[in-house]
UniProtKB/Swiss-Prot annotation:
PROSITE patterns: GUANYLATE_KINASE_2, PDZ, SH3. This is Tight junction protein ZO-3. It comes from Homo sapiens. The modification Phosphothreonine is found at T325. One of its GO terms (molecular function) is cell adhesion molecule binding. The keyword Hydrolase does not apply. The gene is TJP3. InterPro entries: GK/Ca_channel_bsu (IPR008145), Guanylate_kin-like_dom (IPR008144), P-loop_NTPase (IPR027417), PDZ (IPR001478), PDZ_sf (IPR036034), SH3-like_dom_sf (IPR036028), SH3_domain (IPR001452), ZO (IPR005417). It is a peripheral membrane protein.
Length: 919
């Protein structure tokens, strides 16, 4: 006897225990020895006991492949599972093969399975029922196809004449892929086995889950594959252009290959025994289904592609439901592994004639119940047609996570007359698939159809799945990131700021005081920074969010929205009425556009669909706070192989500095972190182009402590601690939604630096919320240049020393200076030092006194600490009293408005960003 190790694939649906979780411990991964993700422990009495075993290799979690994933990524995926998790594992199993002698004429063969003599038979557990209750055409397993022999190929069951050279290069057994088992050869002809499963009660399940795997059935002599000699007939295709082919339908595979643009990359697994290409066909007059082997659809799809494909409702089009036995909590990818169109394209013409020719239902043509039953499919899938009246008469349940189901039928409605019942799943309406639609989108689509229009519904009876869905209260499931601010509305309305992430569970949740869902609200759960779910409540739906975001932008534009203050409005109005804002009108008018306007310019929707992914590149690092310059220098000096400061370039139309996005990309290609010194608006830009920077903010303890820390770290630095401290306070107030992590600055130790390095290492390995949809090509083509509208906004939001006030109060009401001298010329640089200047006066560009250009710099724009007013030399003597009154008014209001920021200035006004002020 010869021993052979095979891999069996199992899928377990685990319910989360409040105390034990899922009851498993995992180890391994790409970053650990061995590489495979394995179950290292099973908690006794936990949800996984008896279902998973120690040593199981984890293949997939909730439809997310664990191949090449790190252990941290797998742990975070499991943490995001709220109630249930669908875990697919593969388990090694040893079988014994009868010893056979190798053929002397075939020295290249490595083991006894390669002999031509013996034939193969099914294992003893093969008769567990391949028919099941599946509606799948492309989701059938290899075991199912192995039981369907066809005429004309029975004599070739053991032949290897179609093998290509080198087919026996691998010595060991073939691992399982999606349920495929390599069967030992016996002296008995392999025969199909028919199994019939009959439900005694509606609550019973067939208990069969079908899978699929794409393989190479035939290689033409004139194609590139024949000349390449790297592919052979029977090879299992594991990846197509880097995308896993597991559970892909043939129609999805065809679309994937069509997008290859002349270059096709395949990762294959060699089938040395040529098992798949030598499956005996079923006899046409037998009881087995006469449907062709599923792999034959590949040639038909390539020869006669459909004339048109209906566009998906929002996301990439996926396949309809796979099986009536699917669990409602399974991953959408596993539930949608079959395809209606892939099984109907290959129908004979005599079967297609059953539907009227005038129907436009060509691609998704579904045969009658009788023909589907004859072909081995579920008899429940059928087509229903009726004219829409004033109402459809259907109540819908479910969502994008489980599918759309009928939860109620109005008596006497057209739908009731066509036999639609509670528990029917709606697969398609008027050529539009319903598999990926939320409940709100499905209802809006049906309500949007005009009365009198003919409706064509593809439905399937799934009462058992429907009742499971109702009991488990599942339906919609997707994640969003907010891009506007909303105040909480008690008792159940959640508030949020820009950048918050929510898990949406129901898109038609009843609002406060409503007994039935009327739309307008979503049930959502806030996701914390640790990827754990927090409080649950309702948020506005998509259309309502767009209205609120537009209203917020309009309010902030006039200075009455969130973040504005009455005092700042009064101060701005006071100076505006007296015409004393010298040369600042244009600047302040442009600088009204804050981050909300930037979000609108960046084409962010109010809600952005996001998914949790692991970064495949070194993310750029943005360090904000009063010691950012010191931290960047220390990182590049200590670890030059991991960090690099992004180079700045000058604008062509202004002396300001910018960083090109192409510079960030080049540094990432070097496998380094790009260190950036940019504005919050530039951070928004980086997030929009999906660079997802790690933003670390240093929180100063106090201004004296900050001054002592900078003198200890950089004694030669001449930067003003007053300005750095004020800048940090503004950043913390207006841009905290952009921070990835914060580090307090306490004392004069270097613990902040060690914590910074630890945060960067941790954040690089953690999964991040990324946009569900990729960027369009037009934006990627212009990454080397700043966005036009964004560049203008960024320039307005950067620091301009000419419009900043230099007065501060020390708590006693008096004015003092931190020793900074400013030039009030036309854009000249300012000096920012902690040494006191020779004169105890400050230059303020916002002062109402207009200086004559012929005056000396000492006299121009200065106010003596002991002099009440200064007469403008350009004014006539008759205006001295008016100027004196203005000076008196200014002095009277100075204390009142000293600490209030001008509403006309942006959140970034007054920031000292260094050479890189824009991105």
């Amino acid at each position: 006897m010869e021993e052979l190790t095979i891999w069996e694939q199992h899928t377990a649906t685990l319910s989360k225990d409040p105390r034990r979780g899922f009851g498993i411990a995992i180890s391994g991964g790409r970053d650990r020895p061995g590489g495979s993700m394995v179950v290292s422990d099973v908690v006794p009495g936990g949800p996984a006991e008896g279902r998973l075993q120690t040593g199981d290799h984890i293949v997939m979690v909730n439809g997310v492949s664990m191949e090449n994933a790190t252990s941290a990524f797998a742990i975070q995926i499991l943490k995001t599972c709220t109630k249930m998790a669908n875990i697919t594992v593969k388990r090694p199993r040893r079988i014994h093969l009868p010893a056979t002698k190798a053929s002397p004429s075939s020295p290249g063969r490595q083991d006894s399975d390669e002999d031509d003599g013996p034939q193969r038979v099914e294992e003893v557990d093969q008769g567990r029922g391949y028919d099941g209750d599946s509606s799948s055409g492309s989701g059938r397993s290899w075991d199912e196809r192995s039981r369907r022999p066809r005429p004309g190929r029975r004599g070739r069951a053991g032949s290897h004449g179609r093998r290509s050279p080198g087919g026996g290069s691998e010595a060991n057994g073939l691992a399982l892929v999606s349920g495929f088992k390599r069967l030992p050869r016996q002296d008995v002809q392999m025969k199909p086995v028919k199994s019939v499963l009959v439900k005694r009660r509606d609550s019973e399940e067939f208990g069969v889950k079908l899978g699929s795997q794409i393989f190479i059935k035939h290689i033409t002599d004139s194609g590139l594959a024949a000349r390449h000699r790297g592919l052979q007939e029977g090879d299992l295709i594991l990846q197509i252009n880097g995308v896993s082919s597991q559970n892909l339908s043939l129609n999805d595979t065809r679309r994937l290959i069509e997008k290859s643009e002349g270059k096709l990359s395949l990762l294959v697994l060699r089938d040395r025994g040529q098992f798949l290409v030598n499956i005996p066909p079923a006899v046409s007059d037998s009881d087995s289904s006469p449907l062709e082997d599923i792999s034959d659809l590949a040639s038909e799809l390539s020869q006669a592609p459909p004339s048109h494909i209906p566009p998906p409702p929002r996301h990439a089009q996926r396949s309809p439901e796979a099986s009536q036995t699917d669990s409602p909590v399974e991953s959408p990818r596993l539930r949608r592994e079959s395809s209606v169109d892939s099984r109907t394209i290959s129908e004979p013409d005599e079967q297609r004639s059953e539907l009227p020719r005038e129907s436009s239902y060509d691609i998704y043509r579904v045969p009658s119940s009788q023909s589907m039953e004859d072909r081995g499919y579920s008899p429940d899938t059928r087509v229903v047609r009726f004219l829409k009246g004033k109402s459809i008469g259907l109540r819908l349940a479910g969502g994008n996570d489980v599918g759309i189901f009928v939860s109620g039928v109005q008596a006497g409605s057209p739908a009731d007359g066509q036999g639609i019942q509670e528990g029917d799943q709606i697969l398609q309406v008027n050529d539009v698939p319903f598999q990926n639609l939320t409940r709100e989108e499905a209802v809006q689509f049906l309500l949007g159809l005009p009365p009198g229009e003919e409706m064509e519904l593809v439905t399937q009876r799934k009462q058992d799945i429907f009742w499971k869905m109702v009991q488990s209260r599942v339906g919609d499931s997707f994640y969003i990131r907010t891009h506007f601010e909303l105040e909480p509305s008690p008792p159940s309305g959640l508030g949020f700021t820009r950048g918050d992430v929510f898990h949406v569970l129901d898109t038609l949740h009843p609002g406060p005081g409503q007994s039935h869902a009327r739309g307008g609200h979503w049930l959502a759960v806030r996701m914390g920074r640790d990827l754990r779910e927090q409080e649950r409540g309702i948020i506005p739906n998509q259309s309502r969010a767009e209205q609120l975001a537009s209203l917020e932008a309009a309010q902030r534009a006039v200075g009455v929205g969130p973040g504005s203050s009455a005092g700042s409005n009064a101060r701005a109005e006071f100076w505006r009425l007296r015409g004393l804002r010298r040369g600042a009108k244009k600047t302040t008018q442009r600088s009204r556009e804050d981050l909300s306007a930037l979000t609108r310019q960046g084409r962010y929707p109010p809600y952005e669909r996001v998914v949790l992914r692991e970064a495949s590149f070194k993310r750029p690092v943005v360090i904000l706070g009063p010691v950012a310059d010191i931290a960047m220098q220390k990182l590049t000096a200590e670890m030059p192989d991991q960090f690099e400061i992004a180079e700045t370039v000058s604008r062509t139309d202004s002396p300001s500095k910018i960083i090109k996005l192409d510079t960030v990309r080049v540094i990432a290609e070097k496998d380094k972190h790009a260190l950036l010194d940019v504005t919050p608006s530039a951070i928004e830009r980086l997030n929009y182009v999906q660079y997802y920077p790690i933003v670390v903010f240093f929180i100063p303890e106090s201004r004296p402590a900050l001054k002592a820390l900078r003198q200890w770290l950089a004694p030669a630095s001449r930067r003003s601690t007053r300005r750095l401290y004020a800048q940090a306070q503004k950043l913390r107030k207006h841009s905290s939604h952009l921070f990835t992590a914060t580090i307090p600055l306490n004392g004069t130790s270097d613990t902040w630096y060690q914590e910074l390095k630890a945060i960067i290492r941790e954040q690089q390995t953690r999964p991040i919320w990324t946009a569900e949809d990729q960027l369009d090509g037009s934006l990627e083509d212009n990454l080397d240049l700043p966005h036009h509208g964004l560049a203008d906004s960024s320039a307005d939001l950067s620091c301009d020393s000419r419009v900043n006030s230099d007065y501060e109060t020390d708590g006693e009401g008096g004015a003092y200076t931190d020793g900074e001298g400013y030039t009030d010329g036309e854009g000249g640089p300012y000096t920012d030092v902690d040494d006191e200047p020779p004169a105890p006066a400050l230059a303020r560009s916002s002062e109402p006194v207009q200086a004559d250009e012929s005056q000396s710099p000492r006299d121009r724009g200065r106010i003596s600490a002991h002099q009440g007013a200064q007469v403008d030399s350009r004014h006539p003597q008759g205006q001295w009293r008016q100027d004196s009154m203005r000076t008196y008014e200014r002095e009277a209001l100075k204390k009142k408005f000293m600490r209030v920021h001008d509403a006309e200035s942006s959140d970034e006004d007054g920031y000292d960003w260094g050479p890189a002020t824009d991105l």
